[in-house]
Regions:
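Extended, small/polar residue-biased N-terminal targeting/export presequences
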Residues: 1-57, 105-107, 111-122, 130-135
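Generic hydrophobic, aliphatic-rich segments that mediate packing or membrane embedding
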Residues: 28, 39-41, 74, 90, ...
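Residue-level recognition of conserved structural "scaffold" positions that shape functional pockets
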Residues: 49-51, 78, 190
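Cleft-lining beta-strand/loop regions that shape enzyme active-site pockets
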Residues: 57-60, 68-73, 80-85, 92-198
C-alpha cells in the first residue's frame, strides 16, 4: 500500500512537468539530505571510480582529516575496505563501507603505483565537515574564492574566507563557481545577503 501511495505522489509531481519539482520517499530523502548537509561521519577522503576498469582511486584526502592523517595520498588505489575486496564493486557501496559512526575504525588496504607498494591503514572515523570553499589573495589585492558546492556549511566557510581576505587588505573579489553542481538555495541567499546587504 505504501508503494502504491508513493507512486501516486510521484505521478502528481511528474504531471507538473516541472524539472525542479519531485517527490522523494523517506529512503530517497535521507541520502539527499546527507549529500547537502556538508558533513558526515567518515574519514574525509574523496574517491572516484573509473567507468571502464571499475578501479577506485583516492582523488583527494581532506587536509586535517583522518584519511590524510593516516597517510593516504591522491592516486592511492583501493584494494580492500573493512576486509572486503573492492574489485568490481560499485563506488557507492565501497563508500558506505568507509563511512560509519564516529569513534569506530575501518581497515583500508591501498596500492600506491608510484612506489609499487601496498599500504594498510586503520583509520578512525569522525565527523567530517566538507571543505566547499577555497580562497587566496591574488595580485593587486584581489581576493579569489572558489565555491565547489552549496551545502549547509558553505555560507559559514564563505563568510570566514571573505573576512580573512578583507583583513589582508582585499580591494576586489572574484567568486569562482565554475563546475559547481549546485545545492541549497538557502546557502546561496545567505552568501548574497553577506555580499549585498542592501
Amino acid at each position: 500500500a505504501k508503494d502504491y501511495q508513493d507512486n501516486i505522489y510521484k505521478g502528481f509531481m511528474n504531471a507538473l512537468d516541472d524539472p525542479y519539482s519531485c517527490y522523494y520517499t523517506a529512503d530517497e530523502y535521507q541520502p539527499l539530505m546527507e549529500s547537502t548537509s556538508g558533513s558526515y561521519e567518515g574519514i574525509g577522503v574523496v574517491v572516484s571510480q573509473n567507468v571502464q576498469t571499475k578501479i577506485i582511486t583516492v582523488v583527494r584526502p581532506f587536509e586535517g582529516c583522518p584519511g590524510a592523517e593516516a597517510g593516504m595520498l591522491p592516486g592511492d588505489i583501493l584494494i580492500e575496505v573493512a576486509g572486503n575486496d573492492v574489485s568490481g564493486i560499485d563506488v557507492s557501496t565501497v563508500v558506505s563501507w568507509i563511512k560509519g559512526e564516529g569513534g569506530t575504525t575501518v581497515d583500508i588496504r591501498v596500492y600506491r603505483e608510484s612506489e609499487d607498494k601496498y599500504y594498510d591503514f586503520t583509520v578512525e572515523r569522525r565527523k567530517i565537515e566538507v571543505p566547499t570553499v577555497a580562497y587566496e589573495m591574488l595580485e593587486d589585492n584581489i581576493g579569489y574564492v572558489q565555491v565547489t558546492e552549496f551545502d549547509e556549511v558553505t555560507s559559514d566557510q564563505y563568510i570566514a574566507a571573505v573576512d580573512d581576505l578583507k583583513a589582508q587588505g582585499m580591494e576586489g573579489l572574484i567568486v569562482d563557481i565554475r563546475d559547481n553542481p549546485g545545492g541549497l538555495l538557502s546557502c546561496v541567499v545567505d552568501m548574497l545577503d553577506y555580499m549585498l546587504p542592501e
